[in-house]
Structures are given as C-alpha cells and as structure tokens.
Amino acid sequence: TPERVIIFASSKLKVKEVTKALKMMKLNVGEMHSDLEQAQREEVMHEFKAGRINILVATDIVARGIDIDDIRLVINYDVPHDSEDYVHRIGRTARANNDGVALTFVNEKEQSNFKQIENFLERDIYKIPVPEELGESPEYKPRSYDGRGKRNFRAKGRNTNKGSGLSLIH
C-alpha cells in the first residue's frame, strides 16, 4: 500500500481548498470535516484505512481517536490554536514503534502560537529553512509576552537573512 499522509487544517474551508488543490494534481485524496454526514466520514475513513485514499485532509475531528498505525507523515497546514491539539495531530504518526515525520507550516501571524506550543512541550522544535526557490520568507521571531498578558512588540522589517527561520513559513 502507498504511504499514508494526514494533512491537518484548522477550518473546513482550508480543508476543502487543500483537498481541491491536491485533486487537481491528480493525487489520491479524501477530506474529513464536520460538514460531512457521519456515514460519509465513516466511508472516507474506511477508504483511507484500506489504502484506496492515501492522503487525508482533515480538521482536528481526526486528530483524536483514530487508530491507524502506518501513517508516516503528518502535515500541519497551519498551527493549531491549542497546544494539546498539536500533540494529538502529531501523535497520528510514529505509532506502533514506527518512524514518522510531522511538518508544520507556520506563517508570520502564527509564530506566537507556535512558540506557545514549544513552551507547552518544554522544548524547541527543530526548524529548517524554507527552500530558496519558494521565495523570501519571514524570519522566525515570535512576539513574546511579558508575563502580565501584554505583548512585547518588536520592530518589523524585511528579512534579508536568506535561509533563516522556521521551515515552511508561508
């Protein structure tokens, strides 16, 4: 069977957009979100487990409670708002003593949320540079909080340090 991939997105609209783009690329993809009836969700999950769909694009409805052991790649199309949702999303890979990879796309506005996830996990998550052929990307420089609920704002500017920052910042 082909490798299975789950792509998580935080909204039904994003799930539908990503699914449409992947289908236009002739990829074998299914979608899962709350607009689907329960029977439709069960059918998509059955097709995914059977290997007839090898890419599943889903909201966090799938992050908890599915039991599929051979997912090798989880892609977070965006940063989840809740740190525990992140843990559940990436927990879909590397199950049953298998290796797996989780990638997270982080845009400039989501950097603070991503930093909160790192704080929750009590570790820095490895960051790789955005490939140059994708163009210039913002530097990974999340705004910090001063402990009283107020943000410490930093001056913004163009990042001229090519290759720095978090992988796949868009």
Describe each PLM feature range:
Residues 169-170:
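Conserved small/polar residues in nucleotide/adenosyl-binding loops
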